[in-house]
């Protein structure tokens, strides 16, 4: 069918401010994938989309996005093994714009972007070009 499910996870602002981000992500990944066998998990993408960044114009700092995406990959490795974890694309979503996307894509565990409102802008092509610079198809 060519469809690729995207499983979105992310914390609220109060959870981030209280230092709960990583435990929230651990729980969301564990509970959200419960019952899925490894071959199915390999076929999905997971997007780290902090709730506080959705449509607000706020974006996670590159190190925050890396920390979250790395934790998601670690949790996948704990649950399914390193091979499966390496096959899952982990995306960042949350107020992506041409001016912040390259710094996010430069992080080793950010495999791409989940683009919302920016996909309706003329500058969307710039986002695609940036992504391809870091992760050629």
What would you call each of these model-derived segments?
Residues 1-137:
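Active-site loop-to-helix "anion-binding N-cap" substructures in soluble metabolic enzymes
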């Amino acid at each position: 069918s060519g469809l690729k499910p995207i499983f979105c996870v992310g914390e609220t602002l109060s959870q981030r401010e209280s230092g709960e981000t990583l435990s929230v992500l651990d729980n969301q990944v564990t509970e959200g994938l419960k019952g899925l066998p490894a071959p199915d998990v390999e076929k999905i993408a997971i997007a780290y989309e902090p709730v506080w960044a959705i449509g607000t114009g706020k974006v996670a700092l590159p190190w925050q996005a890396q920390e979250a995406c790395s934790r998601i990959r670690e949790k996948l490795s704990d649950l399914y093994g390193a091979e499966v974890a390496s096959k899952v694309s982990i995306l960042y979503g949350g107020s992506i714009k041409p001016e912040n996307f390259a710094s996010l894509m430069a992080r080793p565990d950010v495999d791409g972007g989940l683009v919302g409102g920016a996909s309706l802008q003329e500058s969307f092509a710039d986002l695609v070009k940036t992504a391809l610079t870091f992760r050629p198809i």
